[in-house]
A protein has these predicted regions:
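N-terminal low-complexity or simple alpha-helical regulatory segments
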Residues: 1-82
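Ligand-binding loop in jelly-roll beta-barrel domains
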Residues: 48, 57-61, 77-84, 118-136
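Glycine- and acidic-residue-biased ligand/ion/polar-headgroup-sensing regions
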Residues: 71, 81-102, 111, 141
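Alpha-helical bundle regulatory/interaction domains
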Residues: 98, 103-232, 248, 253-259, ...
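Conserved hydrophobic/aromatic pocket- or pore-lining residues that grip, position, or stack substrates
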Residues: 199, 238, 262
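Terminal helix-turn-helix DNA-binding modules in bacterial transcription factors
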Residues: 232-240, 245, 249-250, 268-310, ...
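Short hydrophobic/aromatic patch on the recognition helix
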Residues: 262, 266, 311-312, 316
Length: 337
């Protein structure tokens, strides 16, 4: 996740109260919102922040933008009276659900998921990167198919048909691709004065595309909850002391997990191999130390796990585009202006 995306999320939630979920209804029919009808609620930590912006597109179709600063939420709602499909898109960060059937599902930037709303009546939502921005469409199959919008009607596309293709037995995940981006990205940036007609067009485009998209060959990998819990413990240990480098073999012996399974589950949860993920954290911490301390480059290199200052400088430049010394100069220059 880019530093700029994280800062945008922090800024957007700067006025949101801690420990609360703020729900804004962007359309007049908020009393008929599916979130209200299903008595949706989320319980979060005292330091967490969340904002949901909902918009009714058609009878039976709602769009909800969601922004979180949190590591975990407990989320529950009543089972809907009819079949409701939820289509999620991740714009920034990473999100994971532990559904009531034990299945864990994770999305990274650009990914799309589809599942029945009855699967997540009570679920734990995790944000491995501690912040998240995305959206989801809630689609009541019967209500939409009873009065479909023009483009879907002309193309012979039904909500029930899309549901049966992707959600009949399991949840489905469609990996990030240019087609996903072309449908979803504009929804986050379009002028709010034309959001409703634009979102209606994009929803119809999405349904037409999904009606012609093959369902994934395999369902999301059903890793066990205890395996994910162990990997989260490992992640916390790795972050607790960035100056130490621990091998996969060492971790697998200590936590009694097969090395291959450890690597697979870690990537499933955090979206990256262990080495790449930890490199990001090491260099983010290094950038913070360069901005906020007078520590020497060799001291900072050691604090983030680099024995060689030259290797540290090379790794830093590969991510930030400049050497650490120049990065520090640029930071001080901006502060003095």
């Amino acid at each position: 996740m880019s530093h700029s995306s994280e800062q945008e999320i922090i800024a957007r939630l700067s006025h949101a109260p801690c420990g609360k979920t703020v729900v804004n209804h962007l359309s007049e029919n908020c009393a008929h919102s599916m979130l209200n009808a299903c008595r949706w609620c989320a319980m979060c930590g005292k330091e967490s922040k969340a904002q949901l912006d909902t918009l009714e597109l058609y009878s039976g179709v709602e769009l909800c933008f969601q922004t979180y600063l949190s590591s975990q939420f407990t989320h529950r709602h009543d089972a809907p009276a009819s079949t409701v499909m939820e289509i999620n898109h991740c714009r920034a960060g990473r999100i994971g659900w532990r559904m009531k059937d034990g299945l864990s599902l994770y999305l990274g930037e650009g990914d799309v998921s589809l599942h029945s709303m009855s699967r997540c009546t009570q679920s734990e939502i995790e944000f491995p990167l501690h912040c998240y921005e995305g959206l989801f469409f809630s689609v009541d199959l019967d209500a939409l198919d009873a009065n479909p919008p023009e483009l879907m009607r002309e193309a012979g596309v039904t909500a029930r048909g899309v549901y049966e293709r992707f959600c009949q037995e399991n949840s489905a995940v469609l990996s990030a691709c240019p087609q996903n981006a072309s449908i979803f990205d504009g929804l986050y940036t379009i002028d709010r004065t034309i959001l409703l007609p634009y979102a209606r067009l994009k929803f119809q485009e999405l349904m037409l595309v999904l009606s012609r998209t093959p369902a994934p060959v395999s369902a999301p990998t059903p890793y066990k909850a205890d395996q994910i819990a162990v990997v989260r413990q490992i992640h916390e240990e790795l972050l607790s002391d960035l100056g130490q480098r621990r091998t996969i073999e060492e971790l697998s012996k200590r936590y009694l997990m097969n090395p291959s399974t450890l690597k697979d589950v870690f990537k499933f949860v955090y979206g990256q191999p262990i080495a790449a993920h930890m490199k990001e954290h090491r260099l983010e911490r290094a950038a913070l130390l360069l901005r906020t301390t007078d520590d020497s480059l060799s001291e900072i290199a050691a604090q983030v796990g680099y024995e060689s200052q030259s290797k540290f400088s090379s790794a830093f430049k590969s991510v930030y585009g400049v050497l650490p010394r120049e990065y520090r100069k640029q930071t001080f220059r901006l502060k003095s202006e």
